[in-house]
Amino acid sequence: MEILDGKYILCSFLPGDEKGILDLWKTAFKSNMDPDLFKWKYLDNPYSKTMMLCVTDNSEIVTFYGGIPFKFQYNEDIVYVVNLMDIMSHPNHRENRIFEKTARRFIEYFCTPDNLLLMYGFPGEFHYSIGERILNYKKISNVLYLKAFPNELFNKKNSAQKNIVELEIIENYDGPAKEFDLVWENCKSYYPFSIVRDASFI
């Protein structure tokens, strides 16, 4: 989709766009993203690719709006949601509202009733203020949550008391993936509004 008389093109991600996105990351954030991290987050994801780009007429990627899709349990239905992240734009191409145009194109293209139930993210205050002003971002209500570190959960209260649970770091798991599916099947009724944590998620 061309905008501004063909000066820019809005398009979804295609194989080979990785380098341009990583170059944009370096310019926008003054740091480098490990290509393996990008591959793990966006390309090795077993679900769809949800990335919208704004590209100049000389093929430079100047805006990235996207995130990682997940299967999501919504009561009895399985739908898709996107965790927005790594949203960025080139500092020399922020005129003419191209960031807003890219974001709106993302919503038009990906956020259909058959594709996505919702988008969510964890922007900082500055970026949230931009989204609130031009994209109708909304804060969710206060959320109650529990936070604990494993070593705090399983510390011995006294020398005579033994831990009931022992923790072990597992870096590789060669067992059947269906075991993760079984755990999710047994637990999902307790999580009617939750990301599906089955084998494909793991």
Residue positions per predicted region:
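Basic/polar N-terminal segments that are highly enriched at the extreme N-terminus
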Residues: 1-4
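Beta-strand-enriched cores of mature, soluble protein domains
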Residues: 13-16, 84
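A short acidic/small-residue loop/turn micro-motif
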Residues: 69-71
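Acyl-donor binding region in acyl/amide transferases
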Residues: 75-145
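Generic anion/oxyanion-binding catalytic loop in active/binding sites
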Residues: 10, 73, 91-92, 191
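Amide-forming acyltransferase catalytic core, primarily the GNAT-like/NAT-type
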Residues: 6-11, 18-58, 62-66, 79, ...
